Amino acid sequence: MKIALIAHDKKKEEMIELAKDFEDKLSKHILVATGTTGLKVMQNTSLDVKRCKSGPLGGDQEIGAMVANHDVDMVIFLRDPLTAQPHEPDISALLRLCDVYKVPLATNTESAKLIMADI
């Protein structure tokens, strides 16, 4: 299974903790991430992560293309709902594509934990 990991700046620490908590499970899957999220996960775990561009520089769109091409099976996107994002249209497009292609999507740590418990 290919799993995409994305976290807004204020959610990066939560993503690191999630990756640590589920490191054993995640290690059995192919991981892709936006640039900084992937780097931080790799720096804090033993997980191998293929890094796309940073979200604001096109990384969300890269992962959206993977969703549209059936090249990713699950997306964990820890969003910061209290901070405006300059690339909000890209984020909305990615979320829409997950719905269109019925790709499981977690946008907070609790929903991510529920999904991770099942992989």
UniProtKB/Swiss-Prot annotation:
GO terms for biological process: methylglyoxal biosynthetic process. Keywords: Lyase. It is an enzyme of class 4 (lyase). The keyword Lyase applies. HAMAP family: Methylglyoxal_synth. PANTHER family: METHYLGLYOXAL SYNTHASE. This is Methylglyoxal synthase. It comes from Clostridium perfringens (strain ATCC 13124 / DSM 756 / JCM 1290 / NCIMB 6125 / NCTC 8237 / Type A). The gene is mgsA.
